[in-house]
């Protein structure tokens, strides 16, 4: 099959979060399976040009219809770790992608509405006719709308769209100006409850809702999160829309790239290891202590790696630090705050605990250090308030770092409680799970993990081995997506 991914991110060249990893990992898996995959991305001024090989002009004179006129664009082509990528650069006074950032501009809705239009215009004018167009999150929610309302009448009638929602919280909103700009000129038609009109605000268009309504198939990033979105509180107002389109909605668990996250070959850790050579994990633990100036004592290391925000359960992350110390464990935190107040809170904790030889708080993100923490820590806490998929716990399992997670979203699909999970046999369980968002719930799981490390080291090692035996690569998700592609291709 010929597959084109249209997205706002692709790691490592454009990466603001997990979306970039997913777009790259899925593309790579599809190519390994023998399919032709190309990516269409914005040409941001801040993307990592050092990660692109052979960047050159591919289409110099792309004129994208916009507000009754047209904006001139250049399309550049280059290879990102073997993936063929096209980068769209508009030449206009709006400077849509020359802002010094990927997201966070007041006109993000207009920026990505233009990108969606430009991506389809590029496919049309360059005579690219993929079997499948796979687009991601609200930034490309208008792609299926534009394809089936405009471009199918210009020679793109045979293309099918798979639309993946990575986070329902961010949906993308706009007013009538979006319709005027993109050429969707029938305002009363699109401002209808079963098309683009937002379910709560009758004066707003909802990009994500448009993606759901007009695409051929909709996925989200784990089976449990699909259920939460359909029946729970994590759809942020799109529950009824998902109900109307439940026949084409499914959760597909993300994978992780084992060429990057693999203790057997990881270039960022000093000692490689497997489930059969876990003694080398202990050597990485010592290396981690030496680098972070933790005291070299016989204690478990509990770690947290990720954003510091409400979604990630930041109040429980904070409590995990002090609970670990109370249970005679060490704690390592690597995280970046998205809100100034949370950043100031953890900066204060860093200063307060600076002289404690059992704690290290590293604010910001450090790719190399994250690998060493996964390899050196014994326990990984993931106390998310909600978690559509989560990659952290999958990486932890691969590195033999026992996850302690809250039972939501993709965490439910990947971590099985050692003591209580009835879905798996005892020899298939791989971590600890709690369900409520209070401190006592976290303690109930974290204490069991630390106690097992102290009282039954052989059983703790066996739990590590069981976690490392799980395959959370892109192998199975790639197969699922190909089944979806084949299904919609012949509809």
From Swiss-Prot:
EC annotation from Swiss-Prot or TrEMBL: 2.4.1.21
SUPFAM superfamilies in UniProt: UDP-Glycosyltransferase/glycogen phosphorylase (SSF53756)
GO molecular function: alpha-1,4-glucan glucosyltransferase (ADP-glucose donor) activity; alpha-1,4-glucan glucosyltransferase (UDP-glucose donor) activity
Pathway(s) per entry: Glycan biosynthesis; glycogen biosynthesis
Binding site for ADP-alpha-D-glucose: 15
Reaction(s) the record says it catalyses: [(1->4)-alpha-D-glucosyl](n) + ADP-alpha-D-glucose = [(1->4)-alpha-D-glucosyl](n+1) + ADP + H(+)
NCBIfam families: glgA, PRK00654.2-1, PRK00654.2-4
Family: Belongs to the glycosyltransferase 1 family. Bacterial/plant glycogen synthase subfamily.
Protein name as annotated: Glycogen synthase 1
Species: Synechococcus sp. (strain JA-3-3Ab)
